[in-house]
Amino acid sequence: MAEFLDDQETRLCDNCKKEIPVFNFTIHEIHCQRNIGMCPICKEPFPKSDMETHMAAEHCQVTCKCNKKLEKRLLKKHEETECPLRLAVCQHCDLELSILKLKEHEDYCGARTELCGNCGRNVLVKDLKTHPEVCGREGEEKRNEVAIPPNAYDESWGQDGIWIASQLLRQIEALDPPMRLPQRPLRAFESDVFHDRTTNQRNITAQVSIQNNLFEEQERQERNRGQQPPKEGGEDGANLDFMLALSLQNEGQASSVAEQDFWRAVCEADQSHGGPSSLSDIKGAADETMLPCEFCEELYPEELLIDHQTSCNPSRALPSLNTGSSSPRGVEEHDVIFQNFLQQAASKQLDSLMGLSSSRLVEESIIIPCEFCGVQLEEEVLFHHQDQCDQRPATATNHVTEGIPRLDSQPQENSPELPRRRVRHQGDLSSGYLDDIKQETANGPTSCLPPSRPFNNMTATYNQLSRSTSGPRPGCQPSPPRVLKLNNSDSQDIQGRNQNSQNGAIAPGHISVIRPPQSLYPENIVPSFPHGPAGRYGASGRSEGGRNSRVTPAAANYRSRTAKAKPSKQQGAGDAEEEEEE
């Protein structure tokens, strides 16, 4: 029967897309078209009665917690494999986090350390799984290693200085310089270096091995150099440029400028060791124009004179490039000069020649020269120094102006305008005096005034003269008159008025005001006015007093004495004045 079923023929149903046996195909096709329908989305056959349920359960749109919309039948798969907000467990602490924050958390969590119970070391949490494989081996490797003493680190620059000096020596010999160096200067240099080493440094195994390797390398290079023909200057120039760039990498200068600065520093260092005489001997070898330095009076070529005077000027106070003690003056050969340079490289002074030590000092305190005297000072002190510098132009002019006489001591000009301006700024008057002047001005008579004289000044002068010239009242003691000052312009004006009165320009009853005294002593004063009636004098004083602003103290003193000597006449003058006023 099974063989019969396998051998029977089938046909494809157009509705449900399934293979149906031929003998049952007609009945199935009728039933399928009546009861079964095809889903338009998933293309699967479903009963027509369950089609709505299928669409609502499988193909409706839902929103995931990551705000993504998809069909409901795909939501489960999305949440398990694709959703970025799905939960995941940290591999270090078993904490559930979203997949977005899991990587950041694992990096932070794995950076923690935990103490290993076997080796006693702190191990990172992320390395705990692989730590048992290497646990205990790192301690054995450290114990087998040879510890490098601290002195070996201190001598690292000494080794670099030896290597740099040796390389520079070879490059200089290859360039055929004008001054000839000794054939084997390195041997003497190496011996000096080893004599300077202490016994503790010689016993260091690592340091000795480094030195041996260095000298073996030097000997090997010398043998290769003797066997090979001389090369062209391209490779040597490249090595020299590399050495200069290495030594001046902090300067930021061009290669040519850096090379000039380097050799200038070498020459100045040699000069500090051997004195200026050795440098002058080297420079004097060439037939050049030699000029004397204005500070040390040594002869130098014309091209190097400015640089030398800059460093030789005592007022510049330039710091020395060499910290060692200077040797006594004497003529040194070229090989001795270069030996000193190599010794500086071995004694940690090559960094000063390269300008490395100065850069460290600059970081600590900036040194700036004074713009007036050139003395180099720290940045904090420079401002106060320049403010009090002796060579500052503003400060120098103050010293010069001290010897110039003041304007007060110079003779005054004869211009009449200057005294008038000065009178207005003289001593202040008391308040009581001003009140009296105002009251008398309101009651007193006025006279014709010239347009050139101010009215207030004339009125005040008139009141003062009328009070001073009037005699004492009967039964009262004569009081001394107030003292007024007379300026130059007013005195000249009064003298002109006196001359006009004598010529008849003024009425005969008017008299002139007192002239300024010729002496400081009141005994020598001779009055210039006639002894006329007091009433006329009072009238004259009223008319002429307006032109006089102040009266000299000597004239006032003379009036007080005259009043005391002749009381009867003054009393009679006072009675006559009262009669005229009535």
UniProtKB/Swiss-Prot annotation:
Function: Negative feedback regulator that controls excessive innate immune responses. Regulates both Toll-like receptor 4 (TLR4) and DDX58/RIG1-like helicases (RLH) pathways. May inhibit the LTR pathway by direct interaction with TRAF6 and attenuation of NF-kappa-B activation. May negatively regulate the RLH pathway downstream from MAVS and upstream of NF-kappa-B and IRF3.
A GO term for molecular function: zinc ion binding
Protein's gene: TRAFD1
Phosphoserine PTM positions: S191, S278, S320, S326, S327, S409, S415, S430, S470
Pfam families in the cross-refs: TRAFD1-XIAF1_ZnF
Residues modified as N-acetylalanine: A2
Keywords noted in UniProt: Acetylation, Metal-binding, Phosphoprotein, Zinc, Zinc-finger
Cellular-component GO terms for this entry: mitochondrion
Annotated region (Disordered), positions in chain: 216-238, 402-509, 522-582
Keyword Translocase on entry: no
Positions of TRAF-type zinc fingers: 27-103
Protein's UniProt name: TRAF-type zinc finger domain-containing protein 1
Chain ranges passing through the membrane: none
Biased segments, Polar residues type: 454-471, 486-504
Subunit: Interacts with MAVS, TICAM1, TRAF1, TRAF2, TRAF3 and TRAF6.
Organism: Macaca fascicularis
GO biological process: negative regulation of innate immune response
Superkingdom in the source lineage: Eukaryota
